Amino acid sequence: MTILLIVAGILLSSVPVVLAYIRFRNLKDEAAYKDLMTKAMIVGLLSCPAGFLLSGVFAIIERVFHINEMGLLGAAYHKIILLALAEEIVKTFLFIRFTKKHSYPYSWLDLIAIGTTVTIGFEIGESMVMLGSEPIVMLLRGISAMHMCFGFVIAWGYGKYQKTGKILPFVLCFLLSWLWHGLYDFGLSEELLALNDNFAALSISLAVIAFAYMIYIFIFIPKAAKKEVYTTPIIR
């Protein structure tokens, strides 16, 4: 039964994000765009080690200051900072670096597609790393496509920043994704659940929201493709 749940978790974590990637990739027929999408996926798949590296830096801070011995506070640091913040920083950095490195007349929708694709690659890579995790955790993350949702929000905010020159939406989108990610992980921590099992409802609720948001992403893609505000190349 456990093996079946693990297999189900892997499939569930792959199918929605792969479908989203295909949908984004097929927005344009031009070879240059499809090449960018392929490269963005590769960057995402290879981004897990960079995430582990930054988490390692935060882990050193955790050890030096004995944060891991601070009970619930230590668990909050581990889940919200060491894991969630490190991963969101790495994915966002690699996404922005990618768009700077590869010259292309990006539209707002292009930036959303590239940014989401980088996180899709990260999500697929992480699902392989998480093979030893609790099956229920894999199922929750798989059904809700958490990283894809985080990446979409950040990419939308970055695209808004590039479109308007106003950085606040980008900052708010990053903070939203980080807290969404961090609180989800923290809600499943042993230290918090030891106080009351009902705290698991926090993570379940955030996973349900992510599932609903994943559906919204699939609705958003074809609608945005018909709007000039999203498809017109950004000139700054």
Functional labels for PLM-detected ranges:
Residues 1-236:
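Hydrophobic alpha-helical segments at protein termini of multi-pass membrane proteins
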